[in-house]
Amino acid sequence: MIAVFRSGLIINLLACFTVMLAAQEDPFRDNEDIFMEYSDSVLLTKEFSGGIILHSQGFGIEFQKGKNVNFFKKRLLDFSLVDMRSPKEVRVVNPYFTNAKSYAYGKLNSVFVLRGGYGFQRLIATKPYWGGIELRYFYIGGVSVGMAKPVYLNIINLVSISSYYYEYKLTTEKYDPDEHFTDNIYGRASFVKGFNELKVYPGIYGKVGFSFDFGAYSTSIKNLELGAIIDVFPNPIPVMAYNDKEYYFLTLFLSVSFGKRYN
């Protein structure tokens, strides 16, 4: 009698276990596409992307290389080159000459910032299997190199031809706030003028924000990022005349990038 009871109990347990296994297998059988999509996301461990970055004091280009630590965490290498303008910059034109070129009055240097950093990106919300947006947050830190190029302008000089006749002559000169004013500045000179006098200011930067991935496929990247960046320089950078030199730049940014995931 006891043996029969034990046999029945074992049969019932085996039956229940079989039903449970079947129930666990059904989601993968019925949703094979979902399973394959998540499998691809895990298997593709590397990525590379590039794009443009717009920030509150200029614009530039950026590149990122990433590698998954796991499904929820990613290591990032971050590179960017941006120009950095002063909020006090105002472009003006000499009103006495019809072909005069605009320039930023009072600007001493054109400033560019080259960044290279390392950080992490973490998953907040993944895409549904039918598509959508993947949301992550990131934090990055690294080396920031400020580069200041002196501003050159075309200056109007009066040349005496006779006691009652003068002629205008244009010369290209480095901007000097004590010598150059709105009435004798004709306009900006060639952009490349002054690169041989470039000065370098080493520093550091930090970058935080959110990443929105709109890519329809796991192999492609269509990314939008929003966040903030701070660049700090031990030696301050002169940007505008009669203003304090800049020890740091704090900017808000928006970037759009495209790329691919691979192994």
What are these regions (language model features)?
Residues 1-41, 263:
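Cleavable N-terminal export/targeting peptides
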Residues 44-48, 55-59, 73-75, 110-114, ...:
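Residues that define the transmembrane beta-barrel architecture of outer-membrane proteins
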Residues 52, 61-67, 116-122, 141-145, ...:
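Residues on the lipid-exposed face of transmembrane beta-strands in outer-membrane beta-barrel proteins
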Residues 140-225, 229-245, 258-262:
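Outer-membrane beta-barrel transmembrane domain signature
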Residues 81-115, 119-130:
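Outer-membrane beta-barrel translocator/channel fold
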Residues 37-45, 91-102, 182-191, 232-235:
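Flexible, solvent-exposed coil segments and beta strand-coil junctions
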Residues 24-80:
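Short glycine/proline- and aromatic-enriched beta-strand/turn motifs that initiate or cap beta-hairpins
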Residues 40-46, 68-76, 108, 125-135, ...:
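Short loop/turn motifs that connect adjacent beta-strands in outer-membrane beta-barrel proteins
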